From Swiss-Prot:
Lineage start: Eukaryota, Metazoa, Ecdysozoa, Arthropoda, Hexapoda
UniProt record, GO biological process: cell division; centrosome localization; dorsal appendage formation; flagellated sperm motility; meiotic cell cycle; oocyte nucleus localization involved in oocyte dorsal/ventral axis specification; posterior mRNA localization involved in anterior/posterior axis specification; regulation of fertilization
PTM annotation, UniProt: Phosphorylated.
GO cellular component terms given for this protein: cytoplasm; INTAC complex; integrator complex; nucleus; perinuclear region of cytoplasm
UniProt name for this protein: Protein asunder
Family designation: Belongs to the Integrator subunit 13 family.
Length: 689
């Protein structure tokens, strides 16, 4: 509730230095049309044309007052009655401009007090009594004073044993220092006074609230074009009670700096409404497009954007922060069915409240009109993401839902990413969930099967992905047959029934009966296609039995089915049982056919000339075929058999390690030995000579 931005205190340096000009000259020659140059001309330009008295420059004090008052205006517009801002002017002493009382937390009171303070006099002699330290001491004392909300919370607590009220705050000091040493001295004095104030607030004195934490922001301002010896510094933790950051900025840019800081201080975002059609002031028959920058809560963008949208951001000239660019959307009539739901509404305030585009937009909204704003999608199209409207004299930005909202109907399960799917086995899935319901037991049963045995091992999600479960709607005995296959306690009688059904399938295949598929539209299939369907049916049936083969009766059924497949000419390849079981678990029944070994293809080619055609038609992988690793391994072995093996491996006895380069080093030894035998002869010949 009591956050760090609950209390903000501005300490304004009112010493003699702040009476000098900011060196940003503003033209006053309005009778000759628009000024030819930018209003923020340099000092040299001002001196060149300033002899006619058509330009003037604000003082450092005026720049500091205007920017700080704009800061508190934004705070009070967006957080009326919730966030508090105080002002303290420091020269020979600390002058309190306003208090935490709601009666002084308004623009009129602050501006009237600033008028009474006035610009610092240049005729005041330089003295050590003029210092900003007086204002910093008063700011710490002001942080210890409770606000009305804190007083109400203290009254609700009642006793001292309850947790004390959190008390955090921020002090923004606008001053001008000579160098980093002066800044370091200012930090040390502030930290010392902060510790002393907490000592006074602790029992038994209890003079005010204990300050839990303080954030000190020092703005060192200088005239335009003057270099400062004070370096910028990001947020630094001085002590457990104090964090300090330092910014050096020219006087004309202090408003941009405070706007940048307020975004982080109050979690705000900047939005620029572009392409606002507006009548020209001098020519009512023509119109031009203007831009207006507004501030609001950052959540206005975060709750709207989805993965398909990206915020278009830009940096305003002279500023250092990013602003989101949204385009003015021409209102178009639409019924209530086309209105987008609102995710949230947030107060809005313009950055430059005195500009003509801002005032026109504010009056347009206060007259009861609404403005729709567009943001681009990643695909290139646009979507209406926000709406500006006014109620009760306050302007709000509404975040519209541009993605699927919770009020929309749930997406249909038939709208899959691969197209429209309409044959999900929804009813069977519900039955499976009921059968798989688990309940906790007070005493563990040692004879109970493990949990992995109770989990479903094979369940096609769609009817079109399974031949076996597709036919159960058209063959009367097939549902009961499938129920018997997955029984954990299959007995001999169930095995006999299943054997009879398997033999019926074999007889139907022998007679050439066509399986009753709905997609055949009653047309009789070719014999080769009917055989392929029976082969697919046998393979899926074998996969289902193998996954549920937990009893001896299941294993007998599996052997019987494999023998029938062999008699039908579709015998499975011999492979390792572990690999086949793994493939049964991990593969879909309609996955593509694997490549078969060259030897098996050659053997089957003599018996069936259409084996390649049938293999291309097969859409199911059986448990006895090879994996990708087997295919790659066999290909590597076939290539290695064509090359002669390493001679060292061939000559080395089994169990020993082959020596690489066995003659390596032998020639060098022979050369050394030969050289040693030749050297004495050479010496003898030289002695003789």
């Amino acid at each position: 509730m009591f956050e760090r931005n609950q209390k903000t205190i501005f300490v304004l340096d009112h010493t003699r230095y702040f009476s000098i000009a900011s060196e940003e000259y503003i033209s006053m020659d309005f009778l000759k049309g628009k000024p030819s140059g930018d209003g923020g001309a340099t000092g040299a330009a001002g001196n060149a044309t300033g002899s006619g008295g058509s330009q003037f420059s604000k003082s450092l004090w005026t720049c500091a007052c205007e920017s700080s008052i704009e800061y508190c205006r934004v705070v009070w517009d967006l957080f009326p009655g919730k966030k508090h801002v105080r002002f303290i002017v420091s020269d020979t002493a600390a002058h309190i401009v306003n208090t935490w009382s709601p009666s002084t937390q308004n623009m009129s009171h602050v501006m009237n007090a600033m008028v009474m303070v006035g610009v610092p006099s240049r005729n005041v002699p330089t003295s050590s009594d003029y210092s900003v330290i007086h204002g910093l001491r008063a700011a710490i004392e002001a942080l210890a004073e409770p606000t009305d909300e804190q007083l109400a919370a203290m009254a609700d607590l009642g006793t001292d044993e309850l947790p004390r009220i959190p008390n955090k705050g921020r002090v923004i000091c606008i001053t001008s220092a000579r160098d980093n040493t002066s800044m370091k001295s200012l930090e040390d004095i502030f930290n010392t006074v902060l510790v002393q104030q907490n000592t006074l607030a602790a029992p038994p004195a209890k003079k005010g609230l204990v300050i839990d934490h303080c954030h000190l922001v020092i703005l060192n301002i200088v005239p335009l074009g003057v270099e400062s010896l004070v370096t910028n510094r990001s947020l630094l933790k001085i002590s457990p009670l104090l964090d300090v950051e330092i910014h050096t900025v020219s006087a004309p840019d202090i408003s941009y700096k405070l706007t940048h800081l307020i975004l982080n201080h109050y979690d705000l975002a900047s939005t620029t409404v572009t392409n606002i059609p507006m009548k020209e002031e001098q020519n009512a028959n023509s119109s031009a497009n203007y831009d207006v920058e507004i501030l609001h809560s950052r959540r206005a963008h975060s709750i709207t954007c989805g993965p398909d949208f990206s915020l278009p951001t830009s940096i305003k000239q002279g500023a250092t922060y990013e602003t989101v660019t949204l385009k003015w959307c021409t209102p178009r009539g639409c019924g209530s069915a086309h209105l987008q739901p609102c995710l949230g509404q947030f107060l809005v305030t313009p950055v430059d409240v005195t500009s003509r585009p801002s005032s026109c937009l504010i009056n347009f909204l206060l007259n009861g009109r609404s403005v729709l704003l567009e943001m681009p999608r990643k695909t290139g199209s646009k979507a209406t993401s926000h709406m500006l409207s006014a109620r009760g004299g306050e302007i709000f930005v509404h975040s519209l839902c541009i993605t699927r909202s919770c009020m929309d109907e749930a997406p249909s399960i038939t709208d899959g990413p691969g197209g429209r799917v309409s044959d999900y086995r929804t009813a069977e899935l519900g039955q499976l969930i009921k059968m798989s319901r688990m309940v906790p037991l007070k005493v563990k049963d040692p004879s109970a099967p493990p949990l992995t045995r109770r989990l479903p091992r094979y369940f096609p999600l769609t009817t079109s992905s399974s031949i076996l479960f597709h036919l159960q709607r058209h063959i009367s005995w097939l549902p009961h047959f499938l129920h018997l296959l997955v029984k954990e306690d299959m007995d001999k009688q169930d095995e006999v029934r299943c054997q009879q059904h398997i033999h019926e399938l074999y007889k139907s295949a022998s007679r050439g009966d066509v399986l009753p598929f709905t997609h055949t539209n009653g047309a009789r299939l070719k014999l080769s296609k009917a055989k392929d369907q029976y082969r697919l049916l046998y393979r899926e049936l074998e996969q289902l039995i193998q996954l549920n083969a937990t009893t001896m009766h299941h294993k007998n059924l599996l052997e019987s089915l494999q023998s029938l497949r062999a008699a039908y000419g579709d015998a499975p390849l011999k492979s390792e049982p572990g690999a086949s079981l793994l493939r049964s678990f991990t593969e879909s029944p309609l996955s593509p056919e694997r490549l078969e070994p060259i030897s098996s293809v050659g053997a089957s080619g003599s018996s069936n000339s259409n084996s390649l055609l049938k293999a291309s038609k097969r859409r199911m992988s059986s448990c006895g075929q090879r994996s990708l690793l087997d295919i790659i391994s066999s290909a590597e072995r076939s290539q290695s058999n064509k090359r002669l093996d390493f001679s060292g491996r061939l000559c080395t006895p089994l169990g020993q390690v082959a020596k690489l380069y066995p003659e390596f080093g032998t020639k060098d030894k022979d050369a050394v030995t030969t050289g040693a035998s030749i050297t004495p002869n050479v010496k003898e010949e030289s002695v003789r000579s």
